[in-house]
């Protein structure tokens, strides 16, 4: 997550010798890369379309609509649209922005004479993001993205000097590895189910299960918990989230510890890292600033949709045909990473064309404000949703059907689009961006915009 990557860093006392005074100045409005802000804003709001499912329904329903939330009529249609157009695509755009932010932060610092001293600022920023992510995951919502982004950020810094070609090739190799892992996982699931069924037959025959049989049975049960959990497990999850803050905290802690473990984390980390590398390459080639030609963006959009949408639609149709059977899904979803990257890049191209054309200015200005406050808005999603769905709030967990959750999304979008530009009329940063920056430099940063700057800001927003 890189919500303030479009602004120059400000110097901490301990880094003053390495970072010259100009870096202390906030980046003037004229220097903002608004296209990147708009892209980040679109990605952030789009991510909520997916995250709302994990906020409002049992976690297995995110992938498998037969678990909860309805799997027919408008609910199945909602799942279908979600999978084909959105699932993983919005996160991909957000990861692109994070990678671009690495290039922005480091290149601006180095151009202003910071040299390798920018590494000090970069790693302090990243470590604070890591801490924010841990707190967010355990205290508010297990589906946190800050922690894995920070982990990726720790190893992104050395890649900043590499050529766009090398970055893109590395990203393509990671996507290929992830595709191979999905196929391998399918064979693993098939073998695990076979061994679990054998253990079940042994138990029914009254024979004592071996250690291998016990392990096979448990491994398969763990797989089903994530894709097709038994009704009693679903009910327990619902009860936990509708209960007290403590019961929800215990459930969150269990999920977070599982998701932070190696088996769950490597595919997700590689997925994010690949897109961050693409973002770094695209930033170097001016793709994310709407500076490439119309032909370039049109070709990217056309090719991305032509390649990605049919692949995604076929996988969705096959999933429905097998009724989301766990053993079949890894084979069906083998094309997931290819399809999501293709469609995400097409979405990117469309957004860049809108910005380039100067169309929908009333909306893009608000999206840019949402993007500039991405950290604050991201956490606002978690706070609002936890109060709507969990027992220490309204307790609406698992009470909405899948399609109905999107009405909640619309209200949160409205809040972000209204609140963000109003806040930025008066302050340089969002509240959490300011906190993050102050912690990074271990010095309270200027927050309020001076009156003359505020007037310029307002005039700029109201001008055509």
Language model region names:
Residues 2-464:
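Alpha-helical transmembrane segments and their immediate juxtamembrane cytosolic regions
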């Amino acid at each position: 997550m890189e919500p303030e990557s479009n602004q120059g860093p400000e110097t901490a006392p301990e880094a003053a010798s390495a970072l010259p005074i100009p870096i202390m100045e906030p980046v003037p409005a004229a220097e903002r890369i608004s296209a990147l802000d708009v892209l980040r804003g679109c990605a952030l709001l789009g991510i909520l379309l997916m995250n709302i499912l994990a906020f409002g329904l049992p976690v297995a329903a995110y992938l498998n609509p037969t678990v909860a939330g309805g799997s027919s009529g408008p609910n199945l249609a909602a799942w279908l649209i979600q999978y084909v157009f959105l699932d993983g695509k919005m996160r991909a755009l957000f990861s692109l922005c994070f990678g671009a932010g690495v290039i922005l932060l480091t290149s601006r610092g180095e151009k202003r004479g910071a040299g390798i001293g920018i590494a000090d600022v970069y790693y302090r920023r990243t470590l604070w993001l890591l801490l924010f992510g841990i707190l967010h995951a355990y205290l508010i919502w297990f589906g946190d993205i800050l922690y894995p982004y920070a982990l990726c950020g720790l190893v992104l810094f050395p890649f900043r000097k590499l050529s766009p070609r090398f970055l893109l090739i590395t990203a393509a190799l990671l996507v290929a590895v992830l595709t191979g892992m999905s196929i391998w996982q399918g064979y693993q699931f098939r073998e695990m189910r076979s061994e679990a069924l054998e253990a079940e037959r042994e138990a029914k025959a009254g024979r004592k299960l071996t250690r291998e049989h016990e392990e096979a049975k448990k491994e398969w049960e763990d797989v089903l918990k994530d894709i097709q959990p038994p009704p009693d497990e679903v009910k327990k999850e619902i009860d936990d989230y509708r209960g007290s803050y403590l019961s929800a905290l215990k459930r969150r802690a269990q999920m977070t510890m599982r998701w932070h473990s190696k088996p769950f984390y490597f595919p997700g980390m590689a997925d994010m890292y690949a897109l961050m590398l693409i973002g770094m390459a695209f930033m170097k080639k001016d793709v994310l600033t709407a500076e490439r030609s119309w032909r370039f963006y049109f070709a990217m959009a056309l090719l991305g949709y032509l390649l990605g949408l049919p692949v995604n639609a076929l996988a969705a149709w096959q999933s429905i045909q097998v009724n989301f059977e766990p053993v079949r899904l890894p084979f069906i979803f083998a094309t997931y990473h290819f399809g999501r990257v293709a469609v995400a890049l097409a979405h990117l191209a469309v957004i860049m064309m809108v910005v380039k054309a100067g169309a929908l200015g009333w909306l893009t200005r608000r999206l840019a404000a949402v993007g500039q406050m991405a950290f604050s808005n991201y956490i606002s999603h978690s706070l609002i949703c936890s109060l709507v769905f969990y027992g220490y709030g309204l307790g609406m967990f698992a009470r909405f059907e899948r399609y109905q959750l999107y009405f909640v999304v619309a209200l949160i979008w409205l809040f972000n689009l209204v609140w963000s530009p109003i806040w930025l009329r008066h302050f340089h940063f969002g509240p959490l961006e300011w906190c993050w920056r102050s912690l990074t430099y271990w010095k309270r940063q200027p927050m309020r915009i001076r009156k003359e700057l505020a007037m310029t800001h307002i005039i700029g927003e109201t001008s055509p």
